[in-house]
Amino acid sequence: MPPKVSVASPGLLLARIRAAGGLTRQALLQETGMSRSTLYTRLDQLLGAGLLVESRSGSPTGGRPASMLTFDAADRVVLALDLGHHLARVSVCSTEGVPLAERRVQTAASGGIADVVASLSDIGHELLDGFDDQLIGVGVAIPAPVQTHTGIRWRSVALPDADYPMLDDLRRRFDTLVCLENDARALALGTLPDGVELGDDDVLLAVKFSTGIGAGIMTGPAIMRGSTGSAGDIGHMRVTNGGAVCTCGARGCLAATAAGRSLVRDAARDDIATAEDLRRLYQAGDPQVVELVTSAAALLGRTLAGLAHALNPAVIGIGGTLGSTPGVFETIQTTIREFSASRIHEHASVRLLDHQRSSVGLARLVTDTAFSPTRVDAMLDE
């Protein structure tokens, strides 16, 4: 008999229902071992607060319709700000990350990060027009190491001003919950489709290959952030002796050899200034760019093969401006297979991730935070 699931509060009960994508009352009675009266009292609290919705569906056996309890996502939206080195995407999403309104904007302009946040906030307010009182929070992905729960972030090329109070500024502008996350970890959080969960022992590795290179790692349902918020900072793994100086000041880093910023440097052409330029010219078959990007993708693939032996992932997701480019993705995928043992690569699903997966990850992060057991229990006690 499987162990009973501990749901000692209404908040934990809601978390279990959300994780399962919906459960019947009978399934909850079996899973939790709670008495019918106790369970129904807690469900009534959640239903009364508008956190659950109950719907009936036909029984496949023709018997009495089952009553399915699901999280009430209606009239709830998340604002996702996905900041890159040169581009940002501002999206109003459902709690599942489905885009309802979106705009892509340039961020590589004069001024600092405070000016960028001000501009993106203005766009966010424009996109939120028509979603009055539906915003549950703002999710922000940035290309820098960040301690999600404190908002402390480390200096990076894209965000050199580590002292700028980004969280406080955004809270003031939107008067709501704000969640800050590393961009590669946001990608990891959004990698799996809705309703698909990792097993407790499964590992997911998501990699963003763009202007920079970074990774997000999940173990079971948990995202790995590390003691300083730097877990997954694979761009600064040393992959060669010598070479160009990295932005971190060292030599031999993966990013200094293979990241989009480094390929722009190596191309040394007036028509190549960003990873978007590299993607465009790669797709056009430009010989120099194809050679540069293919070589970088192969090096990244070898690095990921090594990580795969350390992590034994069930899923490897590849995204970013360059990583999601057809041809580049296949090079990475093939190289992972070539440089890893069959017991590793034959049991790992390598997936191409489009740009929307980061917004999905931010929507999940905000929703999980806004409706965490602690917050839900406090809400019901008010």
Model-found features: residue ranges?
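Glycine-rich phosphate-binding loop plus the immediately following alpha-helix
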Residues: 180-184, 239-272
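Short helix-capping/turn signature of helix-turn-helix
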Residues: 19-20, 194, 210
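Short glycine-rich anion-binding loops that position phosphate/pyrophosphate groups of nucleotides
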Residues: 58, 143-146, 210-212, 322-323
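Short glycine-aspartate micro-motif
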Residues: 78-82, 135-139, 204-208, 214-216
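Glycine-rich phosphate-binding loop and adjoining helix at the ATP-binding site
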Residues: 99, 106-203, 327-338
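ATP-binding/phosphotransfer module of carbohydrate and carboxylate kinases, centering on a glycine-rich
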Residues: 1-57, 61-129, 133-134, 254-382
